[in-house]
């Protein structure tokens, strides 16, 4: 089944990209989008922001008021500040709990759409061969391993093919990442050498 073969390969590529590069970006983007919607969480976030501004403003007024010369005013500001700070901390804990719940839900949905889909495909197509090997091409023991757990002998199962795809994609991803890091490091080194050479040249001209 070429379509299943290609689907599993591209699904593993997508999983690697999402989990290695874009997971935090996707989570942050979904959170920003959710905060734009008229939900209870967005209301809590706005209230939290307003409370934070109020606490900061009262703190500034307290610092600008002398506790000795204007004790009555300072004490009143202190009480307002302490009350506002307490309310802000309660609201902040409420917001943090909701954010934690949102993060767990997003991670669960991401897993269901990537790794969970792989698990489903492996279960649903466990008896379906990805491709067939040439007859007597390899020992029967190896054929049994390649067809594990339920594919016909002489074929490659979706479990084995998926595992091979995951390993190869990870190796290629690591190689690309190492190459990119090396190129950036070389570029920074060349720029540092140019800057150093320019400084030496200017020093020679001054002399």
Curated annotation (Swiss-Prot):
Could you list this entry's UniProt keywords, alphabetically sorted.
Answer: Coiled coil, Endoplasmic reticulum, Membrane, Transmembrane, Transmembrane helix, Transport
User: Mind telling me which residue stretches traverse the membrane in this protein?
Assistant: 5-24, 111-131, 156-172
Naming one, the record's GO cellular component terms include:
endoplasmic reticulum membrane
**Lumenal compartment segments:** 1-4, 132-155
Q: Which residues lie on this side of the membrane: Cytoplasmic?
A: 25-110, 173-207
Per the record, the coiled-coil ranges are 44-97
One GO biological-process annotation of the entry reads: tail-anchored membrane protein insertion into ER membrane
> What GO annotations for molecular function exist for this entry?
protein-membrane adaptor activity
Alphabetical list of InterPro entries matching this protein: Get1 (IPR028945), Get1_fungi (IPR027538), Helix_hairpin_bin_sf (IPR029012)
Is Protein transport one of the keywords? no
The reply on keyword Membrane is: yes
Q: Sorted alphabetically, which Gene3D superfamilies does this protein's record hold? A: Helix hairpin bin
Q: What topology in the membrane does the UniProt record assign?
A: Multi-pass membrane protein
Q: Where does the record say this protein resides?
A: Endoplasmic reticulum membrane
Q: How does it assemble?
A: Interacts with GET3.
Q: What is this protein's function per UniProt?
A: Required for the post-translational delivery of tail-anchored (TA) proteins to the endoplasmic reticulum. Acts as a membrane receptor for soluble GET3, which recognizes and selectively binds the transmembrane domain of TA proteins in the cytosol.
Name the family: Belongs to the WRB/GET1 family.
Q: What is this protein called?
A: Protein GET1
Species source reads Paracoccidioides brasiliensis (strain Pb18)
The gene name on file is GET1
